[in-house]
């Protein structure tokens, strides 16, 4: 009966990132450049996580169970990679000078990304999560990646090799990764007394650059109605 459909339990889960490295070639067509080997996934509970993975694994075998939604949220590596590269190349992007987003990586920007990543890892530690550094994650997700440093690995990942930089600074790599990635990471840090000065700097500068108040529009604990919870309550709510 139709009424039975509405009584069925719906399981909602999130992955740490998109399973594909891909780009739209034209409306309705996507070029899949690479496929990640492992992607963390979590539901609202361990039971829901196991249920979702069990039903998705015949079609998407690369999903790995995460401990909770805090882990999948903080393992959003794109939020560490994307804003840094776009921000430090904003003038080049505005001048419409094409360059490769990863292949043209430089040691200094890669070093900044690693410093930014340390803030993410410290926030994770405060919530009981041992997060994977970005340099290790590239090899974890893309085993064919070669290189010893983060810079070398970003330049020598076959899935990244031909990905061009965006054509505008109004790109999802800022307009999505700031409000849905760096904002909640920064806010979780504030909730447990972990300072995130580099994250906060990127958020502030990008908000001014694009004239978008990301703090007002982003996924803050206030906007998610989690601002009155302590650390243990946040962990319990997201586990």
Q: PLM ranges: what are they?
A:
Residues 110-239:
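NAD(P)-dependent Rossmann-like dehydrogenase/reductase catalytic/cofactor-binding core
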